[in-house]
């Protein structure tokens, strides 16, 4: 039974079925709506803003050439032929449209570049022992170079403007030349309307100054290689000063030939440690525990070693080795200290190289930003000129209406 405190409240319907209203879609439509909403708001989907008027003007009075096109679904050895597309738009035959000199110049230059690339591939594939044909790749390359010079000698860039000639082999150089021309335009425009007598040249606030600092990476690599060679030479001199003369009859120097200074010191230190009395007692105790023939054989060798002459020879060898070791021990700390210094120097050089790479990357980014800034400034000047013209026209119309 309902709570009596809600019995006489206004706006409550009595004796009617309960109705629960909601703004949500049915369950079958909710999944589809959520999928569409996720697709519209997803960052993985690229939303293109297309201007239909601009697209219509671009493809206006254009038609698709279907000569030689075959899309039939037949089973045969010959492959079907589709539409051909290239990097540049080329006018088809029989369309009634005629190529402009600028389009023809760009098409010829692009075809010459493609032909040069094909000839270079042929030159790399042809072997020296191949028989010379009527038109060799070398002769074809020379003809292509002459054709390129002839194309450049037409001086179409002066007639068609700076946007006609584009160097496909060096696009960055072409953009740099175009930027230089754009920077020269404001100074020419300011100098043209000057009719008053020339004044003393003063500081120009609108001047743009570009400073480029470039260091050849080959020079850094050459200096680094020279330093490494000098360090290796000094290290070789140190090793030649402290190393001992090779003696094939000396058993203590076995295994120490042809090794570095550090490895030689480690080998000699290990052999000197074997001569310690405590180590010899441990070795003797282990040998005594060896059973059978091994113990007898070691006993025979021990008796030979205990001979006075043999002992004197061993003492003499050890004494001579210790004499040489004194000279090595005196210079060894300096060598170790220099090796540690070389290691620190190599670490500093590696960090310096990383800083140079980061600086080079930052310089490239600054160049790109400066290039974009120049383009934005040019666009803003053009837009400002258009706005001023529009205001002038509006003021003229207002004056005429008055």
From Swiss-Prot:
Sequence similarity: Belongs to the dynactin subunit 2 family.
Keyword Transmembrane recorded: no
A cellular-component GO term for this protein: dynactin complex
GO biological process assignments: mitotic spindle organization
InterPro entries in the record: Dynamitin
Top-level lineage group: Eukaryota
Keywords: Coiled coil, Cytoplasm, Cytoskeleton, Dynein, Membrane, Microtubule
The protein's assembly and partners: Subunit of dynactin, a multiprotein complex part of a tripartite complex with dynein and a adapter, such as BICDL1, BICD2 or HOOK3. The dynactin complex is built around ACTR1A/ACTB filament and consists of an actin-related filament composed of a shoulder domain, a pointed end and a barbed end. Its length is defined by its flexible shoulder domain. The soulder is composed of 2 DCTN1 subunits, 4 DCTN2 and 2 DCTN3.
Coiled-coil region: 101-132, 357-402
Localization per Swiss-Prot or TrEMBL: Cytoplasm, Cytoskeleton, Microtubule organizing center, Centrosome; Membrane; Cytoplasm, Cytoskeleton
Organism: Gallus gallus (Chicken)
Membrane disposition: Peripheral membrane protein
Region Disordered, annotated ranges: 1-26
Function: Part of the dynactin complex that activates the molecular motor dynein for ultra-processive transport along microtubules. In the dynactin soulder domain, binds the ACTR1A filament and acts as a molecular ruler to determine the length. Modulates cytoplasmic dynein binding to an organelle, and plays a role in prometaphase chromosome alignment and spindle organization during mitosis. Involved in anchoring microtubules to centrosomes.
Name of protein: Dynactin subunit 2
Gene that this sequence comes from: DCTN2
Lineage: Eukaryota, Metazoa, Chordata, Craniata, Vertebrata
């Amino acid at each position: 039974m309902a709570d009596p405190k809600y019995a006489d409240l206004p706006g409550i319907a009595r004796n009617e079925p309960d109705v629960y209203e909601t703004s949500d879609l049915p369950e079958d439509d909710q999944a589809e709506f959520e999928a569409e909403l996720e697709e519209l708001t997803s960052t993985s989907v690229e939303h293109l803003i297309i201007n239909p008027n601009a697209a219509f003007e671009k493809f206006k009075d254009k038609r698709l050439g279907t000569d030689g096109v075959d899309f039939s679904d037949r089973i045969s050895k010959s492959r079907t032929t589709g539409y051909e597309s290239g990097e540049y738009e080329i006018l088809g035959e029989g369309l009634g449209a005629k190529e402009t000199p600028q389009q023809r110049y760009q098409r010829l230059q692009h075809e010459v570049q493609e032909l040069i690339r094909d000839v270079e591939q042929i030159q790399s594939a042809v072997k020296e022992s191949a028989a010379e044909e009527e038109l060799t790749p070398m002769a074809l390359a020379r003809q292509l170079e002459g054709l390129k010079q002839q194309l450049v000698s037409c001086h179409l860039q002066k007639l068609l403007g700076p946007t006609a000639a584009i160097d496909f082999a060096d696009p960055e150089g072409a953009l740099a030349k175009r930027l230089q021309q754009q920077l020269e335009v404001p100074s020419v425009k300011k100098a043209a309307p000057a009719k008053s007598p020339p004044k003393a040249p003063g500081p120009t606030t609108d001047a743009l100054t570009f400073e480029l600092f470039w260091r050849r990476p080959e020079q850094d690599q050459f200096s680094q290689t020279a330093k490494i060679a000098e360090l290796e030479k000094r290290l070789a001199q140190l090793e030649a000063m402290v190393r001992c003369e090779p003696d094939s009859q000396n058993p203590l120097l076995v295994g120490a030939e042809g090794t570095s200074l550090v490895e030689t010191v480690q080998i000699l230190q290990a052999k000197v440690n074997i001569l310690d009395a405590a180590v010899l007692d441990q070795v003797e105790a282990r040998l005594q525990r060896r059973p059978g023939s091994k113990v007898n054989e070691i006993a025979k060798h021990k008796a030979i070693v205990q001979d006075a002459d043999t002992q004197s020879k061993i003492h003499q060898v050890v004494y001579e080795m210790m004499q040489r070791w004194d000279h090595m021990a005196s210079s060894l700390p300096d060598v170790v200290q220099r090796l540690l210094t070389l290691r620190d120097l190599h670490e500093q050089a590696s960090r310096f190289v990383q800083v140079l790479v980061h600086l080079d990357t930052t310089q490239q980014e600054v160049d790109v930003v400066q290039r974009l800034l120049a383009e934005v400034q040019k666009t803003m000047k053009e837009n400002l000129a258009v706005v001023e013209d529009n205001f002038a026209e509006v003021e003229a119309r207002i004056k005429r209406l008055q």
